[in-house]
Regions:
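N-terminal low-hydrophobic presequence detector
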Residues: 1-2, 40
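Cysteine-cluster motifs in flexible loop/terminal segments that predominantly coordinate metals
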Residues: 2-28
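Phosphate- and other anionic-substrate recognition elements at nucleic-acid/protein interfaces
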Residues: 28-234
Length: 234
């Protein structure tokens, strides 16, 4: 039996078995479901938001909650590694172009250089970068002000009635405006001790700003590279 080989043209099946290039590129390309997949990640030790955008469409907005069940940050990083490995493995055959975008470390917060913050987030970033590297996914970082300006349209704080930090509200508001409000809602347990919340049909909720941020980061990474200030991380 012969087949078309993208490297050596027509080859018989026996030749394929001897070939070191086990993956027939042309056949694999035909099997790919999407032209481009972007994974946006808003990383923190409280919650890490993760969004998948495929061919310009938001496919999934989710998050990893680190607030309970972990003794220290090392356990959180290891758990994140496991989750990312499963995610990255699940999409590897769905596109030839998969990139990961994380939020760039802010060296200064309100004018101060927070060394402990930089070290802890740097360690978290290394987990994400190494996980992406394992699957040969290019990984980029997005400046907070850049993605907010390009996707949300503003980074100016806005007051709101939902007890959301004014700095976070523009992003929440934007995600709601594009039809993904339900994806960034956090339903609170009945016995919750949280004092600030809002209600929908008698149920208590908060907005998940980490999930919202990850969505905007993914949408920013989906733009043509020359329209962004993305920086490749290695």
């Amino acid at each position: 039996m012969s087949k078309y080989c993208p490297l050596y043209e027509i080859a018989i099946y026996a030749d394929c078995l001897e070939c070191e290039n086990k993956i027939c590129k042309k056949e694999m390309e035909n099997k790919m479901k999407y032209n481009k997949i972007v994974i946006g990640i808003d990383q923190s030790y409280k919650r890490t938001g993760i969004t998948i955008v495929a061919d310009d469409k938001i496919k999934k907005i989710t998050f990893i909650d680190f607030q309970k069940g972990f003794a220290n940050n090392s356990e959180k990083r290891e758990y994140l590694r496991e989750k990312l490995d499963k995610l990255f493995a699940s999409i590897k055959d769905k596109s030839n172009k998969i990139i990961v975008v994380i939020e760039r470390i802010r060296l200064r917060s309100e004018g101060f250089l927070n060394i402990n913050y930089i070290k802890s987030i740097g360690a978290l970033n290394s987990i994400i970068i190494d996980s992406a590297y394992k699957y040969n996914y290019p990984i980029y970082s997005a400046d907070t002000r850049a993605w907010k300006s390009k996707i949300v349209g503003t980074s100016k704080p806005q007051n709101n009635k939902y007890f959301v930090d004014p700095k976070k509200w523009p992003t929440i508001k934007y995600i709601c405006s594009i039809g993904h409000k339900k994806d960034i809602l956090l339903k609170l347990p009945e016995n919750t001790k949280v004092k600030k919340y809002f209600e929908i049909d008698g149920e208590k909720y908060l907005f998940n700003d980490d999930a919202a941020d990850s969505c905007c980061i993914a949408l920013y990474g989906n733009l043509p590279l020359n329209q962004t200030t993305l920086k490749e991380e290695k």
